[in-house]
């Protein structure tokens, strides 16, 4: 029998946000005390707590610490000269060290450690993953001025010797817009599928069944008309549409990157199809 409407509705509920807000405020307080050599950085949430897609059990809070007085871009050397851009003597490595020092001074050395991509901070509230980044400017081919760019952020991964570029502000803005376009069904639907995934993992499904970011981006590509009515309607409409869709054309919620590909920040079509099969089996096998 299918999953009951009451169960799907429970799965759509948002998790608590108060402690995440206090975690964010704690990180901000730590950074406010520091004397920054190149101006105070911008501090903001990203991830499920920012996007209102957090569910019960979500723990780590993603906090972005972004330096805007220094930036990277996609311009050629000649284009940079034309705009008068010069190389900064204050690098991402310098900024990373300053952020690490600010957090260590506030929380203590035992509470701050380096992760692969983030600084892991144990606050008195929730653990925080602090992304230390600088502004990234993506200029279009026919740019009109130095201010004609799409804002992202970028950070270095030392263990892999590469830079990562992401667009968390666009991810948030596009998700908020889609939520409005679907009469506020989009974000509850994300939470419904996240909880369904968690339920399946608890029943023995693979731990990497559908990472939250990829799941959110997958659902972003579903037409607005497939959301709404009842949660049963939405579950079936979304899954049935995705099973027939050409996944190779899917974009991330930020609108800038392909969802599927070979880079570490991309998903695989095979794993997305696997997720859809698990959702199918959940729907048809509920209660058995």
UniProtKB/Swiss-Prot annotation:
Molecular-function annotations in GO = ATP binding; metal ion binding; nucleotidyltransferase activity
Annotated residues for binding of ATP: 46-48, 194, 212, 265
Pfam families recorded for this chain? NTP_transf_2
Q: Give the note describing cofactor binding and stoichiometry.
A: Binds 1 Mg(2+) ion per subunit.
Residues folding into a coiled coil are: none
Q: List the disulfide bonds.
A: none
> Region Disordered: which residues?
1-23
Q: What is its EC number?
A: 2.7.7.-
Q: Which InterPro entries match?
A: NT_2-5OAS_ClassI-CCAase, NT_sf, Polymerase_NTP_transf_dom
Residue sites binding UTP per the record = 46, 62, 116-120, 166
Q: Write down the chemical reaction(s) this protein catalyses.
A: UTP + ATP = 3',3'-cUAMP + 2 diphosphate
UniProt keyword list: Antiviral defense, ATP-binding, Magnesium, Metal-binding, Nucleotide metabolism, Nucleotide-binding, Nucleotidyltransferase, Plasmid, Transferase
Q: GO terms for biological process?
A: defense response to virus; nucleotide metabolic process
Which co-factors does it depend on?
A: Mg(2+)
The similarity comment for this entry is: Belongs to the CD-NTase family. E01 subfamily.
- Report the protein's function: Cyclic nucleotide synthase (second messenger synthase) of a CBASS antivirus system. CBASS (cyclic oligonucleotide-based antiphage signaling system) provides immunity against bacteriophage. The CD-NTase protein synthesizes cyclic nucleotides in response to infection; these serve as specific second messenger signals. The signals activate a diverse range of effectors, leading to bacterial cell death and thus abortive phage infection. A type I-B(UU) CBASS system. Cyclic dinucleotide synthase that catalyzes the synthesis of 3'3'-cyclic UMP-AMP (cUMP-AMP) from UTP and ATP, a second messenger for cell signal transduction.
Q: What is this protein called?
A: Cyclic UMP-AMP synthase
The root-end lineage is: Bacteria, Pseudomonadati, Rhodothermota, Rhodothermia, Rhodothermales
